[in-house]
């Protein structure tokens, strides 16, 4: 049988597939992981906001706390869940959960979203 040999170019494409797809910025991720603190991951869609406190592990990131803005509906919030007010309340819920689990600080991770003053991302912070 003939042994398959992968070229360097092919290997590089395999290693950085998520970068090529526009899903991961490895330079920013490395800077966040160097802090050795948990990350507050904020992801926004048109209708919802998701907040997670994530800790790095070699086997994969471990989610310590997860809060979704759809949980506001259970608490009586009848308004839209993708706006600034909902993001603020979701962030408040995440803060209370973090206090109950004795998490004092975290590093903000907004991913590939642009950092804009007054945005939903900072309302959740």
Report the location of each language-model feature.
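Acidic, metal-coordinating catalytic cores used for nucleic-acid/nucleotide bond scission
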Residues: 111-120
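Extended, alpha-helix-rich binding/interface surfaces that flank or overlap catalytic cores
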Residues: 124
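Generic non-transmembrane alpha-helix signal with a bias for helix starts/N-cap capping motifs
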Residues: 91, 120-121
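Intrinsically disordered, Lys/Arg-rich N-terminal extensions and targeting peptides
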Residues: 1-58, 66, 70-74
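Compact nucleic-acid interaction/catalytic patches
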Residues: 62
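Beta-rich strand-turn-strand
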Residues: 98-105, 116
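Acidic helix/loop or adjacent segment enriched in Glu/Asp that either coordinates divalent metal
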Residues: 75-100
């Amino acid at each position: 049988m003939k042994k398959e040999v992968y070229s360097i170019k092919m290997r590089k494409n395999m290693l950085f597939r998520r970068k090529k797809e526009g899903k991961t910025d490895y330079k920013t991720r490395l800077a966040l992981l160097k802090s050795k603190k948990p990350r507050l991951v904020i992801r926004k869609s048109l209708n919802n906001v998701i907040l997670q406190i994530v800790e790095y592990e070699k086997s994969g990131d471990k989610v310590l706390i997860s809060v979704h803005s759809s949980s506001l509906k259970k608490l009586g919030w009848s308004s839209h869940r993708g706006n600034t007010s909902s993001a603020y309340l979701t962030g408040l819920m995440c803060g209370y959960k973090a206090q109950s689990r004795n998490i004092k600080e975290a590093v903000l991770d907004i991913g590939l979203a642009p950092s804009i003053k007054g945005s939903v991302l900072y309302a959740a912070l």
